[in-house]
UniProtKB/Swiss-Prot annotation:
PANTHER family: 30S RIBOSOMAL PROTEIN S2 PROKARYOTIC AND ORGANELLAR, SMALL RIBOSOMAL SUBUNIT PROTEIN US2M. This is Small ribosomal subunit protein uS2. GO terms for molecular function: structural constituent of ribosome. Belongs to the universal ribosomal protein uS2 family. One of its GO terms (biological process) is translation. Keywords: Ribonucleoprotein, Ribosomal protein. GO terms for cellular component: cytosolic small ribosomal subunit. The gene is rpsB. It comes from Bradyrhizobium sp. (strain BTAi1 / ATCC BAA-1182).
Amino acid sequence: MALPEFTMRQLLEAGVHFGHQSHRWNPKMADYIFGARNNIHIIDLAQTVPLLHTALQAVSDTVAKGGRILFVGTKRQAQDNVADAAKRCAQYFVNSRWLGGTLTNWKTISASIKRLRHLDEVLSSGEANSYTKKERLTLQRERDKLDRSLGGIKDMGGLPDMIFVIDTNKEDIAIQEAQRLNIPVAAIVDTNCDPKGITYVVPGNDDAGRAISLYCDLIARAAIDGISRAQGELGIDIGASAAPLEEELPAATAASTFQGLPGPRGTADDLKKLTGVSGAIEKKLNDLGIFHFWQLAELDHDTAHQIGEEVGLPSRADAWVAQAKSLADA
């Protein structure tokens, strides 16, 4: 993978250069405005191109270091694009109403997420049959309400390392919370917005559906590039250290060169689908930082065997890698 490429022509075709009516402008955006035509401000794409590239690089670098990206876009025309892009790159999103304190009061939000998980378990199991129809309906409504607000972050496991925002005016509370916590903000900033406090300003139309789709696609691809880079670096480290580790260190220590993830990227895969993996073995794999089939699929023979020894089933390791490749591609 490589950082996603784009052209000024793509930005033009998506309508990125169209700002708001000139009387609705924010003077702080003057440096990013090329001029006005028919009472509509035109954004200077000669500045947008390098600034967007900088934002994409920041996203890729953040993910490559194991960081989390939170997509934020609650306006109607952004909701689907934000959710789809975040899911595609195994990141997180808020596309319904932003709950005050989502970042600054994470402890309370975590309690709500715990409640959402509990409701999911109750409604998807036989336990739901012990409730009356009215009680089940009440629980379902509560679950749906929580899922709209928290469904995109229920697997985040902690504060994000960067947020990407569509429409800084509408998402001003999210931006203020990120600023208070020193979380970098990459944002699409239209001519009626205030760029102050935005870490990575990307001047552009924040209303056009095609423009929003383009932004989200590029950010998602940048995040995927970061994941690819992280895995590539992992492979290089293992290859470079394999020979000396075999000579100088016991096998159990060699397994420590595997750099697992701090938490699942999105929803963790069901590792119990692998032959011989019980709930207890799955937990051991999780403790080693393995949550997804693609992580196992990319292991070489020696590293897979070392991890197999760590969980007590070294003879299964090669089979797990083969199975994981099939399951990851499914």
